[in-house]
Amino acid sequence: MSMEFDAVIIGGGVSGCATFYTLSEYSSLKRVAIVEKCSKLAQISSSAKANSQTIHDGSIETNYTPEKAKKVRLSAYKTRQYALNKGLQNEVIFETQKMAIGVGDEECEFMKKRYESFKEIFVGLEEFDKQKIKELEPNVILGANGIDRHENIVGHGYQKDWSTMNFAKLSENFVEEALKLRPNNQVFLNFKVKKIEKRNDTYAVISEDAEEVYAKFVLVNAGSYALPLAQSMGYGLDLGCLPVAGSFYFVPDLLKGKVYTVQNPKLPFAAVHGDPDAVIKGKTRIGPTALTMPKLERNKCWLKGISLELLKMDLNKDVFKIAFDLMSDKEIRNYVFKNMVFELPIIGKRKFLKDAQKIIPSLSLEDLEYAHGFGEVRPQVLDRTKRKLELGEKKICTHKGITFNMTPSPGATSCLQNALVDSQEIAAYLGESFELERFYKDLSPEELEN
């Protein structure tokens, strides 16, 4: 079996698998490979246990500006449309209601203004008063005594929307479809990349077991591991990484759909939200928390997996200065300490209960169950030159046949949009064609018309 490929994608999560499919379906590349360190695809950040299983289109994510929401909506549409085109309803993609709520006068005023800006972007977006929310999500309004909560509450969202996705199943489908189209493509599992070497006009991707695959172009979609690989080759040396791990709590099946809350604009992390679990029936997930930790990948044991690559990246005065500046802000500092407490046995659950009761006021301590093995690390990029935290996705384009992607949330939602950008770059670099018009026709006709 030949180990030479036009392109090799490092990382078998949903972003890498989406590009594997996009190159196979729409480009003229002959052979593409994925190398993945786990024994199965999508076992880390794209696992159903690692994320909230949400298609983040911007309609209920209150930290998105209208400008960002317009872009994210188009990205989300591609992912949603792919699943519907392939007939993956109730297997990969699920239809539920969803809403964002404001609790208290200040948040209600914010939500009313937000609705006026966002109803033009999202066709069919509905505004919900307290009575309508009670009709749709009774447990958001009813207190433990069966009496309506006293706070003013408004919201907006959809009574029915394809809003939930199992990104691990989606990853598997991308690869299945790609292999049907291009049987000469390859997927290498249990292939943990040790290093990447430039050899004349190709790259050698070398595993810890001394296996080698060769490519004219390498795309690194390796989540938290992308930046260490880039720095090992001399790229991205001006960047650091702040790994933020999210945890969840299970509660009984008390929500009919997704319920999001207003996010503090100072905080780069999602506000607590409630999501009926698409995989574990009868459970609702509340979270995530946000805990910084010295690891590129979460493990059950606190001391297991502390990352030497991360320490090498971050043990410098610029990163310490960024961290000091962040912690100098009282709100951010309190948020960090509060989330550290959430992880503690016994006391953590008591502290988290108050946050969870913002969504379901009748919750009791007995209702909360820490979701062991759920949640994963999201790499937040630190720009050492600008001395600040960079929000969202980060790309290192070398223009030398290798690109590195770091894709925290909503990277899974945007997987096909990111795959489009990467596939066009790869095809152009290799002198191959890419059928952009057909891509838009299949997955985003709105952009074709515009």
UniProtKB/Swiss-Prot annotation:
Protein name stated in the entry: Probable malate:quinone oxidoreductase
GO cellular component terms, A-Z: cytoplasm
Lineage: Bacteria, Pseudomonadati, Campylobacterota, Epsilonproteobacteria, Campylobacterales
SUPFAM superfamilies: FAD/NAD(P)-binding domain (SSF51905)
Family as reported in the entry's similarity comment: Belongs to the MQO family.
GO molecular function: 2-hydroxyglutarate dehydrogenase activity; L-malate dehydrogenase (quinone) activity
UniProt gene name: mqo
Requisite cofactors: FAD
GO annotation terms (biological process): tricarboxylic acid cycle
Keyword Flavoprotein assigned: yes
EC number: 1.1.5.4
Family annotation (InterPro entries): FAD/NAD-bd_sf (IPR036188), MQO (IPR006231)
Catalyses which reaction(s): (S)-malate + a quinone = a quinol + oxaloacetate
Enzyme's top EC category: oxidoreductase
Keywords from the named record: FAD, Flavoprotein, Oxidoreductase, Tricarboxylic acid cycle
Domain of life assignment: Bacteria
Pathway note: Carbohydrate metabolism; tricarboxylic acid cycle; oxaloacetate from (S)-malate (quinone route): step 1/1
Keyword Flavoprotein assigned: yes
